[in-house]
C-alpha cells in the first residue's frame, strides 16, 4: 500500500498564515509515514515557509508552486486589490493537483471550493485555524464542510459545537502550532531606551478595525508622550490595499495613510515579516488591538 499524500496549502497573497501549519508539515515529514506536498501561492510565501523549516525537513517535502499564467496574473491584478481573485484562480487552475492527494491541510476556508468542485473525487480536508480569534467569520456555516479540525484549545471545540459547525469527535486539540516556530525566551528590542513599549495592532476589516476612525488619534497620543514607545504593526493585509471591503459586514472604506513626520518613539511597520512572526508581540509591554488573535500571542510571553 502506498503512503498517503498530504498537501499543506499556503494559498494566500501574504505569508501571515504560514507559521500556523508549517510546523505540522515538518512533523509529518519527519515521521516518514506520508508524502508531504507544500503547495504555495508565491515565491515569497515559499521563502517564508522554508525559513520556518530546517533544511533537512524541507528536503523531505515536495514543493508545488500554484502558478498562474503571466497573462492571467496580470489580468487579475486590478481586481485583486479589492477581492482575493488570484487565490481563487489558483484553486481552479491546480484542481488536478488537489485531486491527486489524500488529505489537504489548510489554515483558511477558501479551499472548500475545491472540495465542492471535485465532489466524490475530493480528498479529505483538514482545517487548522490561523489563530484563535472569536470573530463571527470563524464560525461561518461553510466550516462544517471540513472533515476534521485541529484546534488550539477546548474553547474552540466548544464554540464549534455551539454554532453547529463541528461535533467534538471531529476536533482534535493540538495547541497553538505557531508557538513551536518561535523562541519564546527571546524578547526583541526596537528602541534604544527602557521605556514601556505599546503595540498597536489594528485589523484590516473596515467594520471591525479601529484604524479608520481612531488610528491617527492613537499615534498623536504617543507623539505627545515621548516617554512611551509605540509600535504600529497592523494586520499585514491592512496596507496591501487602499480600499477594503468586508464581505462579512457589507462595508467598504478607504484606508487612511500613516501620518508623516513621526517622532523617534514611534515605530511603524506595514509590510515586514515581523508583523506575523511574533517579534512585536514579544517586544511589547501593553497590547492595543481590535479582534486579532495576536492578543493570545502577546499573552504567551
Where are each of the predicted segments found?
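Nucleotide-activated donor-dependent transferases that construct or modify glycoconjugates
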Residues: 2-14, 199-200
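Conserved catalytic-core segment of nucleotide-activated headgroup transferases in glycan assembly
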Residues: 17-31, 179-257
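Active-site donor-binding acidic/aromatic loop of nucleotide-activated sugar
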Residues: 264-273
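Flexible, charged surface loops at secondary-structure boundaries
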Residues: 1-3, 29-33, 96-101, 119-120, ...
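Receiver (REC) domain switch-region micro-motif
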Residues: 6, 104, 149, 198, ...
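A donor-sugar binding/catalytic signature common to diverse glycosyltransferases
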Residues: 127, 272-301
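Active-site and donor-binding regions of nucleotide-sugar-utilizing enzymes
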Residues: 9-27, 38-183
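Short hydrophobic/charged patches on amphipathic alpha-helices used for structural packing
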Residues: 93-95, 219, 276-278
Amino acid at each position: 500500500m502506498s503512503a498517503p499524500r498530504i498537501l499543506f496549502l499556503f494559498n494566500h497573497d501574504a505569508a501571515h498564515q504560514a507559521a500556523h501549519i508549517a510546523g505540522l508539515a515538518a512533523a509529518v515529514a519527519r515521521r516518514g509515514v506520508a508524502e508531504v506536498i507544500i503547495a504555495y501561492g508565491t515565491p515569497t510565501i515559499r521563502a517564508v515557509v522554508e525559513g520556518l523549516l530546517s533544511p533537512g525537513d524541507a528536503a523531505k517535502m515536495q514543493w508545488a508552486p500554484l502558478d498562474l499564467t503571466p497573462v492571467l496574473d496580470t489580468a487579475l491584478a486590478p481586481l485583486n486589490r479589492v477581492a482575493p481573485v488570484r487565490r481563487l484562480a489558483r484553486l481552479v487552475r491546480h484542481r488536478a493537483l488537489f485531486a491527486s492527494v489524500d488529505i489537504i491541510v489548510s489554515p483558511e476556508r477558501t479551499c472548500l471550493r475545491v472540495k465542492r468542485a471535485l465532489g466524490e473525487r475530493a480528498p479529505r480536508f483538514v482545517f487548522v485555524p490561523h489563530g484563535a480569534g472569536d470573530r463571527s467569520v470563524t464560525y461561518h456555516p461553510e466550516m462544517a464542510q471540513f472533515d476534521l479540525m485541529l484546534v488550539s484549545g477546548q474553547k474552540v471545540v466548544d464554540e464549534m459545537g455551539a454554532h453547529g459547525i463541528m461535533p467534538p469527535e471531529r476536533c482534535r486539540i493540538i495547541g497553538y502550532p505557531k508557538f513551536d516556530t518561535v523562541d519564546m525566551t527571546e524578547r526583541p528590542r526596537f528602541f534604544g531606551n527602557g521605556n514601556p513599549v505599546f503595540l498597536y495592532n489594528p485589523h484590516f476589516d473596515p467594520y471591525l478595525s479601529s484604524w479608520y476612525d481612531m488610528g491617527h488619534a492613537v499615534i498623536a497620543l504617543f507623539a505627545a508622550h515621548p516617554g512611551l514607545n509605540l509600535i504600529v504593526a497592523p494586520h499585514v493585509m491592512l496596507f496591501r490595499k487602499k480600499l477594503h471591503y468586508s464581505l462579512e459586514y457589507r462595508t467598504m472604506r478607504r484606508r487612511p495613510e500613516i501620518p508623516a513626520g513621526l517622532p523617534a518613539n514611534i515605530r511603524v511597520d506595514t509590510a515586514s515579516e515581523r508583523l506575523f512572526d511574533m517579534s512585536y508581540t514579544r517586544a511589547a509591554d501593553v497590547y492595543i488591538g481590535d479582534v486579532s488573535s495576536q492578543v493570545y500571542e502577546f499573552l504567551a510571553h
